[in-house]
Swiss-Prot record:
Keywords linked to the UniProt accession: Electron transport, Endosome, Glycoprotein, Heme, Iron, Lysosome, Membrane, Metal-binding, Oxidoreductase, Translocase, Transmembrane, Transmembrane helix, Transport
Molecular functions per Gene Ontology: metal ion binding; oxidoreductase activity; transmembrane ascorbate ferrireductase activity
Record InterPro entries: CYB561/CYBRD1-like, Cyt_b561/ferric_Rdtase_TM
Residues binding heme b 1: 47, 112-115, 117, 177
Domain named Cytochrome b561: residues: 12-219
Record-listed E.C. numbers: 7.2.1.3
Cell compartment(s), UniProt: Late endosome membrane; Lysosome membrane
Gene from which the chain derives: CYB561A3
Annotated GO biological process: intracellular iron ion homeostasis
Protein name: Lysosomal membrane ascorbate-dependent ferrireductase CYB561A3
Residues passing through the membrane, by range: 3-23, 46-66, 84-104, 120-140, 155-175, 198-218
Amino acid composition bias (Basic and acidic residues), ranges on this chain: 228-238
Region of interest (Disordered), residue spans: 228-265
Length: 265
């Protein structure tokens, strides 16, 4: 049952994440003319798409790598490398998104970093950069001791969830700000809820629901990878491998691995 709920949640996340990206693309194409890379308003339209894709969807996918049951066994290095690579890709898309909005502001002679949305966003990106550097240097490179990693892991996990929360707040405030700037004239003010406002509000709600589901999976203790030190505290259950060799499975892993064992038998 546990593994079923986990993969059902992953399927829901994939659907919600895709919808968040597609809704943002459609909003920028249908109501704001599409995309370009020339310093115009069409270049700005890349900003929400890249930020939602990088800071929310890809960032969340990278954060959930260690929740996959397949990552609980075998060497950790491939999973660590995948985790770091996905976060790096998310960061690169985020930097492109920032470049798009800064270039548009330069072209249109608009001041930088004056709104609450921009303060939230730049703080989130700064924390993301620090988080990635800390994770790469301490948890991926081999120099750090187990004591140091154990000390920094709770901090790394806390800021991982905090950065996602800040990213969601930045996206929601950015959607709100964009609508206030776009819907100015008397025929389609934001308060009258024209079709663009309804659509963009729905896109924002999708981002919020997506983020809450990601945070739930990250915080659910039954879906976390068991710590190596917990093996001695849990009663091991012996099963038979495919070739008849004994395998040791922790009690906390049995629920997620049960379907695999049934297939083997």
């Amino acid at each position: 049952m546990a593994v079923g709920w986990f993969y059902l949640s992953v399927l829901a996340l994939c659907s919600l994440g895709s919808m968040c990206i597609l809704f943002t693309i459609y909003w920028m194409r249908y109501w704001h003319g599409g995309f370009a890379w020339d310093g115009s308003m069409l270049m700005f339209n890349w900003h929400p798409v890249l930020m939602v894709t990088g800071m929310v969807v890809l960032y969340s996918a990278a954060s959930l790598v260690y929740r996959l049951p397949q990552s609980w066994v075998g060497p950790r290095l491939p999973w660590k490398s995948g985790h770091a690579a996905m976060h790096l890709l998310a960061f690169l898309l985020t930097v492109l998104g920032l470049h798009a909005v800064f270039e548009f502001h330069n072209h249109a002679k608009i001041p930088h970093l004056y709104s609450l949305h921009s303060w939230l966003g730049i703080t989130t990106v700064f924390l993301f950069a620090c988080q990635w550097f800390l994770g790469f240097s301490v948890f991926l490179l081999p120099w750090a001791s187990m004591w140091l990693r154990s000390l920094l892991k709770p901090i790394h996990v806390f800021f991982g969830a905090s950065i996602l929360s800040l990213a969601i707040a930045s996206v929601v405030s950015g959607i709100n700000e964009k609508l206030f700037f776009s819907l100015k004239n008397g025929t389609k003010t934001y308060s009258n809820l024209p079709s663009e406002a309804v659509f963009a509000n729905c896109a924002g709600m999708l981002v919020v629901v997506f983020g809450l589901l990601v945070l739930y999976i990250l915080l659910a203790s039954s879906w976390k990878r068991p710590e190596p030190g917990m093996q001695a505290e849990r009663e091991p259950t012996r099963t038979r491998g495919r070739a008849g060799t004994p395998e040791v499975m922790l009690e906390g892993e049995r629920g997620l691995a049960e379907p695999l064992l049934q297939k083997r038998s």
